[in-house]
């Protein structure tokens, strides 16, 4: 009764399934989730940046099956890690209001996302919207698994889903938005 007594009922005779089309994107997101977790426990910002860049390289290489994709992934991870570190340091100084930092961080993420998307042959606006909107909703995403002060796979997957969805809605690729 598992397959209603027809073992061929749940097969795909064409050999094509959603996994054959999306396995690289899924693998890249999984690598990003796990290497992000390693970066969360890093003692210094340089170590965290190193883990982020390494994870970005592996995720980009898996997604594109190329060294070029790995380099883009590493560069993208380094840029976004640097933005997060810079705004974290500015917040600690107390020289800027919380609203100014929030707006600045959204714009910085949007600009970085736009540039990264342009470098990969996409449109600046798609990358800007994807990264900017994801950063805009980051306070809500941060409330997911709020008891976990370190790395959270749930938060990472929520951000990847939001970024990919915004990218797809603006005419870009889901995978580009999910990874950045």
Where are the regions that the model predicts?
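Acidic glycine-/aspartate-rich tracts in secreted/extracellular proteins
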Residues: 7-8
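Extended, hydrophobic alpha-helical membrane-active domains that insert into or remodel lipid bilayers
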Residues: 11-180
